[in-house]
Amino acid sequence: MAIDEDKQKAISLAIKQIDKVFGKGALVRLGDKQVEKIDSISTGSLGLDLALGIGGVPKGRIIEIYGPESSGKTTLSLHIIAECQKNGGVCAFIDAEHALDVHYAKRLGVDTENLLVSQPDTGEQALEILETITRSGGIDLVVVDSVAALTPKAEIDGDMGDQHVGLQARLMSHALRKITGVLHKMNTTLIFINQIRMKIGMMGYGSPETTTGGNALKFYASVRIDIRRIASLKQNEQHIGNRAKAKVVKNKVAPPFREAEFDIMFGEGISKEGEIIDYGVKLDIVDKSGAWLSYQDKKLGQGRENAKALLKEDKALADEITLKIKESIGSNEEIMPLPDEPLEEME
């Protein structure tokens, strides 16, 4: 539809004035601006990368990862840090819980020598540090662990029985209002790890669970990932890890509500080899005959754990099968449901 000439002149004049005050590009016609592809950082999980629709978590956005205790929230975040560092990214970890296991992070592939770490005393200090490093323009990824541990200074300085209703929620709301635009401008990804609480007096319909820190994070987050432990993995009667399910409950850059399941092995983190086998079997790329698993003419092993061990040693073969899985799923990256259980028994 053609725009009136007088209106065109008025708009052009306004754009020139805005550019003069706020800088060139402060207001543009969408048709004149090239739509940029959304870059992403891999999560370290093949299934979750596909579920997110763009190959990982989006750059320049706020991400929330939440779930019950020991569900894999910090493990997933450390894998994202490792993947970002592999591509030359600079990462920071704001450890509000004062519980970062450096040795575990190193085993997951994190370059701990170059990881920036802060253990702040208060929520205000944590968020000030977050804002400062983000505005520097030199950081690619920041992880805050966790929202629940961002305790306001007034609460720390007060007596044990004092009530501080809504203090943390107001702190988060204020910080997110300040930081969102800067994150986009600097192309910095911010991940908040969050915990689950039960709603007091919840009756009737709806989930009785909620996350800490108020509602602001729910609105500002471009992606929200709910991660849960769904089973224990056993080998020779020994617990060797957990099976986790991650659900993308909010996604502003691709269709939401997709799910992914993966193994989290004790001391090793997310098992990429386990996902390769699961997706390979589902898509008929990996053949399963009884307990034996094979790819083309090559036997991978008898049983899932043996096949995982072989793929862990043969990276080239693992990469080849991964590529075939991605090609089979297609350019739309429609996530295909996995079997309800992995290929060996769990409890």
Swiss-Prot record:
Highest taxon above the source species: Bacteria
Effect of E113Q: In strain: 69A
Pfam families: RecA, RecA_C
GO cellular component annotations of the record: cytoplasm
Location in the cell: Cytoplasm
Any one GO MF annotation of this record: ATP-dependent DNA damage sensor activity
Xref: SMART domains: AAA
Annotated binding of ATP, by residue: G67, P68, E69, S70, S71, G72, K73, T74
UniProt PTM comment: The protein migrates as a 40 kDa protein in strains 69A and NCTC 11637. When overexpressed in E.coli a 38 kDa protein is made which is unable to complement the E.coli deletion mutant. It has been suggested this size difference is due to a post-translational modification.
Any single GO BP term: DNA repair
Keyword Plastid in record: no
Key words, A-Z: ATP-binding, Cytoplasm, DNA damage, DNA recombination, DNA repair, DNA-binding, Nucleotide-binding, SOS response
Effect of D121S: In strain: ATCC 53726
Functional summary from the UniProt entry: Can catalyze the hydrolysis of ATP in the presence of single-stranded DNA, the ATP-dependent uptake of single-stranded DNA by duplex DNA, and the ATP-dependent hybridization of homologous single-stranded DNAs. It interacts with LexA causing its activation and leading to its autocatalytic cleavage.
Family recorded in the similarity comment: Belongs to the RecA family.
HAMAP family: RecA
Designated name of the protein: Protein RecA
